[in-house]
Design a protein with these regions (language model features):
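Adenylate-forming
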Residues: 9, 54-63, 199-206
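Short hydrophobic alpha-helices that are characteristic scaffold elements of the AMP-binding
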Residues: 18-24, 46, 164, 172-176
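Structural core segment of the AMP-binding/adenylate-forming
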Residues: 23-88
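Conserved AMP-binding/adenylation subdomain of ANL enzymes
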Residues: 135-158, 162-206
Length: 206
């Protein structure tokens, strides 16, 4: 049930970390990659995060600037420095029975994530969502648009920021419905990514 923050653009490692943390019984806390150091510090402190996964050296600097005021923050991992690969290797030493126990201890009422508001009216506020929140929404969507998500060879390209709840819904829907999912973080190159990946459908905000 410990909180671990993720601060990165939309990429495969974001989704991989999200599901890995869920499997370990942890609570992912997304942080927009554009967040200011003050916002980063507030979210890490308010959520009680014990660790944070960042994408690059710039994000690392934002975390390190406030680390002296975050006594509960024990670990910082940097995706671009290969830390996710190292974590995956370290995972080989974790007892499977321990992971199974963590997974089976979760149910639909268990806390899945804390998503922070934009903070336009003051400090960002943490919104707690359960695994049931995500699963019920994904299951209902899979039935309502089954002709799209359950079609043979269904695939989608995720380009929305994963710090936003709608993007998290899309990744859960993809896993629930067995949809192949790609990631794109470069809006300028998005059309090229569409041409390369050739998704059969896209979910996006207006």
């Amino acid at each position: 049930g410990e909180a671990v923050a993720i601060m990165s653009r939309t990429r495969y490692e974001w989704t991989g970390a999200d599901f890995a943390l869920w499997s370990a019984g942890a609570v992912p806390v997304p942080i927009y990659e554009t967040s200011s150091p003050d916002q980063v510090e507030w979210i890490l402190a308010d959520s009680g995060a014990v660790g944070v996964i960042v994408e690059d050296a710039g994000h690392l600097a934002a975390v390190e600037a406030s680390r002296p005021r975050l006594p509960g923050l024990r670990e910082v991992w940097v995706i671009d420095q290969g830390d996710i690969d190292s974590l995956s290797q370290d995972g080989n030493d974790v007892d499977d029975a321990d992971l199974d126990a963590r997974r089976t201890a979760l149910d639909r009422d268990s806390l899945a994530t804390i998503i922070y508001t934009s903070g336009t009216t003051g400090r960002p506020k943490g919104v707690e969502l359960t695994h049931g929140n995500f699963l019920t929404l994904a299951e209902n969507a899979a039935e309502e648009i089954s002709e799209v998500v359950k079609a043979a060879g269904a695939s989608t390209l995720l380009f929305l920021p994963l710090a936003h709840v709608f993007a998290r819904f899309i990744e859960v829907l993809a896993v629930t419905a067995g949809v192949r999912m790609g990631h794109s973080s470069d809006l300028k190159g998005l059309l090229d990514d569409f041409a390369s990946f050739q998704p059969t459908f896209v979910l996006a905000v207006p």
